[in-house]
Regions:
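Extended, histidine- and acidic-residue-enriched regions that form the cofactor-binding/catalytic faces
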Residues: 2-134, 142-283
Length: 283
């Protein structure tokens, strides 16, 4: 585990590290147990938490590991806060995921949809060798959402697992919020993500390069727009040369802290329901 303020990058080292906090974060890491200890510690209602991030461009001001850092940090904080009570166990994060909407940019590393689904299927198969039967994807990248929904159902059918997908922070194209300065269109590298990173990993943010790049032309359409009733295929360079879709210039660490606290509160409620969920008696 890293200590708050450590400038090394988890995406490079592969280490587990908490988000900055007043206290040291202690996390229930499944990988720190032996195989027999896992068999003894877990039961059918144990919840394995798999953070799913991404390695992709986030403009000139944010690191390519932004989504990974967000997903892993929130998973660590949630498992540290609620793990004992709800029997949550943290898995290592899935860093390389479905990011080909940023395929054009240096620094983006992605899996095809088919490969990612195969990886998730194999992880689900591996999970069946443990006593746990609840798997929760804690997702930090909007581009993963559709595939995680497919994988959740496939794993339910193939292995009888209880599967869940949690989104602590949704972009505007998936129903999340975007400030007025972004016209409700901020989905990538803008106010929300930059604020989060200013709180979680401020040493990795270059606010001198933060900019506003909002696709205002989309406001001309009622249905074909981010979060509209008609979705459309896009890549991030459709809207500007640096891949930013939003207003990073307005980001603050204070907003990032408030957002982190709100996300953690949501995760506490959501994981409580995940741990107790039963769809009901079968007729």
């Amino acid at each position: 585990m890293f200590r708050p303020g450590d400038s090394r990058n988890a995406a490079v080292t592969g280490a587990q590290r908490p988000a900055p906090s007043v206290r040291r974060v202690t996390v229930r890491l499944l990988t720190e147990l032996s195989a027999p200890a896992i068999a003894d510690a877990l039961g059918p209602d144990s919840v394995l938490v798999l953070p799913t991030g991404a390695i992709e461009q986030h403009g000139p001001h944010l690191p390519v590991a932004t989504d990974l850092i967000t997903a892993q940090s929130m998973a660590e904080l949630a498992v540290a806060e609620f793990g004992e009570e709800l029997d949550l166990w943290l898995l290592p994060p899935l860093a390389y995921t479905k990011s080909n909407e940023h395929h054009w940019s240096c620094g983006t590393f992605w899996l095809s949809a088919q490969t990612m689904l195969s990886v998730l299927h194999d992880l689900g198969s591996s999970m069946t060798k443990t006593p746990a039967r609840r798997l929760a994807f804690l997702n930090g990248h909007g581009g993963n959402s559709a595939l995680l929904q497919v994988a959740a159902r496939d794993l339910r059918i193939a292995y009888g697992l209880r599967t869940f997908t949690l989104h602590p922070s949704l972009p505007a194209d998936h129903g999340g919020k975007s400030p007025e300065s972004e016209l409700g269109l901020g989905i990538h590298g803008g106010h929300e993500e930059t604020s989060l990173m200013l709180h979680l990993r401020p040493e990795l943010v270059d606010m001198e390069k933060a900019q506003r790049w909002v696709p205002e032309q989309l406001t001309e359409y009622r249905h074909v727009r981010f979060g509209g009733s008609v979705s459309f295929g896009w890549t991030s360079d459709d809207f500007g040369p640096d891949g930013v879709i939003g207003d990073a210039s307005t980001a603050t660490a204070e907003h990032g802290k408030e957002k982190t606290e709100a996300m953690l509160a949501y995760l506490g409620e959501a994981f409580a329901e995940v741990a107790a969920f039963d769809p009901g008696p079968r007729s």
